[in-house]
Amino acid sequence: MREILHIQGGQCGNQIGSKFWEVVCDEHGIDPTGRYVGTSDLQLERVNVYYNEASCGRFVPGAVLMDLEPGTMDSVRTGPYGQIFRPDNFVFGQSGAGNNWAKGHYTEGAELIDSVLDVVRKEAENCDCLQGFQVCHSLGGGTGSGMGTLLISKIREEYPDRMMLTFSVFPSPKVSDTVVEPYNATLSVHQLVENADECMVLDNEALYDICFRTLKLTTPSFGDLNHLISATMSGVTCCLRFPGQLNSDLRKLAVNLIPFPRLHFFMVGFAPLTSRGSQQYRALTVPELTQQMWDAKNMMCAADPRHGRYLTASAMFRGKMSTKEVDEQMINVQNKNSSYFVEWIPNNVKSSVCDIPPRGLSMASTFIGNSTSIQEMFRRVSEQFTAMFRRKAFLHWYTGEGMDEMEFTEAESNMNDLVSEYQQYQDATADEEAEYEDEEAIQDE
């Protein structure tokens, strides 16, 4: 029933992914050995969205784990839920991609990709009605970005009508792990624009800010960041896994959020975010959730929605609440901040309600917005890319793996096109649309 196949690649992807499985196992009452220890029938009703049931009654995640070096895999395997995964679904090489996109996409990754695809096929054949794939990866490194995008394009060829959702960690503006991040990210975006259906854009710096500012953590670890991400990931699919009054799924999400096919990069947020100590003092109300979820400080990527306009947005509420109140709040947000929504898409906020809240909360909400301000992120990466590419710095690492400079130029111009598309729709007004069509007609001739 409506399965989602989960794929995680590279160090970042595997760490986010394993955190995500901890959250989902917890929600469905599945212990680290795969046995069901929950208390409610609802946990089992649609457990097969993410799990296969083995013959002995144990639940095995429908997950494929890949990396070009064994290190992260070993730590996943020895982690709290390491024993739950199917051992054959760990696919890894030995050499590593060394933060080099070309190695992940063309050389090392290309050697490993067939064994990954075999596992993906095997998992997909197990499914009743496969809804789509979710991929966790980062765009700054070599494996998640290079091999991740290679896998996405291969899956695209083989399953063209299934949804492809990615959780992509972009390089942060101030915090950089590797000097070649702008190259890797630009080459990846070039692929994601063409081959993914929906990209949830995350970045470490924004997550750090949330940890400092809202959660009051003095020294946030990657574990804390990944916890935020996994809360959002679980929120995106809760409608598939638990009954609700207003359901959404990956395809409905896409139809409601993507006005133009290339503009499928979303900012995500989660509410309520409270510091660990002060959780018990919070009474949650729908207005409070709404306020926190639309707050620019809560966005998990370093772009400020106040600098652009929302093309569309989707709010997924969880918990027992009145749908009437949810609708009122959403209309309220749009009326009060009408300048931040494009006027040529009327009622552009979709809401959905799922009855089961996350563990330890009475209600929660996940926010997904398609805002033109996401271009800040692409523009920033693009500037860093150009600065290095003008001097052809570090290029030999890529050309040495058989890449051509043309590919870089193409990726760069594709990214810049994306930025200007966002800008064009940010500036568009309802009555200007006619002029655009005239202009386009002239250009086409």
Curated annotation (Swiss-Prot):
Keyword Cell division in annotation: no
Domain of life: Eukaryota
Names of required cofactors: Mg(2+)
GO cellular component: cytoplasm; microtubule
Residues reported to bind Mg(2+): E69
Annotated stretches, region: Disordered: 422-445
Cellular compartment(s): Cytoplasm, Cytoskeleton
Record-linked InterPro entries: Beta-tubulin_BS, Beta_tubulin, Tub_FtsZ_C, Tubulin, Tubulin/FtsZ-like_C, Tubulin/FtsZ_2-layer-sand-dom, Tubulin/FtsZ_GTPase_sf, Tubulin_C
Nucleotide-binding as UniProt keyword: yes
Amino acids binding GTP: Q11, E69, S138, G142, T143, G144, N204, N226
One Gene Ontology molecular-function label: GTPase activity
Composition-biased stretches (Acidic residues): 429-445
Pfam name, any one: Tubulin
Subunit structure of this chain's protein: Dimer of alpha and beta chains. A typical microtubule is a hollow water-filled tube with an outer diameter of 25 nm and an inner diameter of 15 nM. Alpha-beta heterodimers associate head-to-tail to form protofilaments running lengthwise along the microtubule wall with the beta-tubulin subunit facing the microtubule plus end conferring a structural polarity. Microtubules usually have 13 protofilaments but different protofilament numbers can be found in some organisms and specialized cells.
Function: Tubulin is the major constituent of microtubules, a cylinder consisting of laterally associated linear protofilaments composed of alpha- and beta-tubulin heterodimers. Microtubules grow by the addition of GTP-tubulin dimers to the microtubule end, where a stabilizing cap forms. Below the cap, tubulin dimers are in GDP-bound state, owing to GTPase activity of alpha-tubulin.
Protein name per UniProt: Tubulin beta-8 chain
